[in-house]
Amino acid sequence: MKHIEKLPEPDFFINWKENFRHSNGREPTYKDFMGTDEWHNLRNILLNEQGFICCYCMKSVGDWDEDANDWDSHIEHFIPRNIGNIQPHSYRAQNVQLNYDNLFISCNGERCCKDHCGHYKKSEDSPMILSPTNPDVEEAFKYNPLDGEIIGTSAEAMTSARVLNLNTLELKRHRRTAIYYSELFDEDFEEKREQLIEFYSSRNEAGAYIPFCMAIVSVMKEWAV
């Protein structure tokens, strides 16, 4: 998982919510917001904020899926937007539907099946699930370079990997492939280690991270030549 540093809430989002309250006399819901011009703008803001990778598994996101006739990703509520129906008295149920700090972009899982990340997590909520905004989230997971397995280093990390189903065969294959082609196994890797870690930790000119970047970085930091 890649740490996400949330930017200030966009003015257009604040204004939309204020205008809705003034016009309708109630708090807006996510259903009210979905599909508006501001919703599309916010989606682009979140994609840029995350560097065009899934907030959970780090797959590339932001493209239109022709087969599904839909985007390859969705706006994700880290604390589920329907938690008020499930845990109405929980402090976590307060103002989550349109709380900017609770909004991310998650992939839709693999094509044809929502088998990991946001859609798999659904309405499950627990303080044991690590948020992408947690400053220590990158160190909470290790990766096996041989099979691509993600390994939680704490109870919270293990819970997160389970709830998000981050060890599907496809995700393990994606991570293993990304690590394999990362120059980790080059003869001169040790000479380039720090340079490569910096490269995979950084965005490209388009503002995007390389898919599965932190899996690569984590393995590179620990790899013994």
Model-derived regions, located:
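A boundary/linker detector
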Residues: M1-H40, V217-V225
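An N-terminal domain-cap segment
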Residues: K17-K59, D63-D70
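Short Gly/Pro-enriched turn/cap motifs at secondary-structure boundaries
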Residues: N44-I45, Q94-Q97, S131
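Extracellular structured ligand-interaction cores
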Residues: G51, D70, Y100-F104, D136-A140, ...
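A structural signal for short, well-ordered beta-strand segments and their strand-loop junctions
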Residues: I53-Y56, H74, I105-S106, A140-Y143, ...
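Histidine-centered nuclease catalytic patch
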Residues: K59-H119
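Long, low-complexity, intrinsically disordered segments enriched in glycines and aromatic residues
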Residues: K114-L169
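C-terminal, charged low-complexity interaction regions
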Residues: I151-V225
